[in-house]
A protein has these predicted regions:
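Extracellular/periplasm-exposed beta-strand and loop segments of Gram-negative cell-envelope proteins
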Residues: 44-49, 81-113, 147-175, 206-214, ...
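Short glycine/proline- and aromatic-enriched beta-strand/turn motifs that initiate or cap beta-hairpins
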Residues: 20-69, 234, 238, 250
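Short loop/turn motifs that connect adjacent beta-strands in outer-membrane beta-barrel proteins
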Residues: 20-30, 66-67, 126-135, 187-195, ...
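N-terminal signal peptide c-region/cleavage motif recognized by signal peptidases
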Residues: 14-17
Length: 250
């Protein structure tokens, strides 16, 4: 029994040493999933409508043996600061309240919601970090940015904010976007601590997708420049290829 335990320990030790040597001394082909969080400040026209926002991020990316980096990223945007002038002004009473169908004062939650999805490409420059697979990560991308105002009135029923009427207030906006990221990409030698962190900028060339704003009784046809500047950080879930058709997640 003791011999078996000794052999098992030696096997695990040799496996760990080999794995660390493989990451430390060679540049790996590395497909991986990323999961992270971002926090951004708006700029341009977006700053006139929303405040700072957070984002939950998920992506699938590949780092080649030559450290080229490419993939697809999806970010879900959310925030609680909305400063759209005159929003719901046509529904307010003289006291500045909104009433539901029963004539009761309705509690409203007005929030930002949106997403951006994009393809990205760039390179890992191994000038810092513990191995050839870590370093300065620089990427650029192109995709779609979308945002709108979320109007939540919970259990209260407000006919003017139901169905097609709601579209007259939500300011749904989207369009082409471009993205830039610079940060640090880290794959540890023991494969246990893998992460990214850095700064990102987004520029969206957007416009309203609603035909009519009911509160202002106007049509919004303006071209917009929506910008986001912020920080991102997240975890890297690696998919290493060990043998033909076999993949392992770390």
């Amino acid at each position: 029994m003791k011999k078996f335990q000794l052999l098992f320990f030696l096997f695990l030790f040799s496996y760990s040493v080999f794995a660390q040597w493989q990451v430390r001394d060679s540049s790996l082909f590395n497909p991986h999933v990323t999961v992270g969080y971002g926090y951004s400040t708006p700029g341009g026209d977006l700053a006139n409508r929303f405040g700072n926002n957070g984002s939950i991020e998920v992506g699938f990316n590949v780092k080649s043996k030559k450290n080229w980096y490419y993939g697809v990223q999806f970010n879900y945007l959310f925030g609680n600061r909305v400063h759209e002038p005159n929003l719901l002004s046509n529904l307010l009473t003289d006291r500045g309240e909104i009433l539901d169908e029963d004539g009761q004062i309705a509690t409203m939650f007005i929030q930002e919601r949106g997403f951006n999805v994009f393809l990205q490409g760039g390179k890992v420059l191994p000038i810092i970090g513990p191995n050839k697979n870590s370093g300065l990560l620089i990427t650029a991308g192109v995709g779609l940015l979308q945002h709108k105002i979320r109007l939540e009135h919970q259990e209260a029923k407000i006919t003017q904010l139901e169905g097609e009427y709601l579209k007259g207030y939500d300011r749904l906006t989207n369009g082409l976007s471009v993205h830039q990221f610079i940060g640090y990409y880290h794959l540890s030698n023991n494969r246990l601590i893998n992460f990214y962190i850095g700064a990102q900028a987004t520029e969206g060339f957007t416009q309203s997708r609603r035909e009519w704003n009911l509160d202002t009784q106007t049509q919004d046809t303006d071209k917009r420049l929506d910008m986001l500047f912020g920080l991102r950080a997240g975890w890297i879930l690696n998919l290493y290829q060990r043998a033909p058709n076999d993949f392992y997640i770390y």
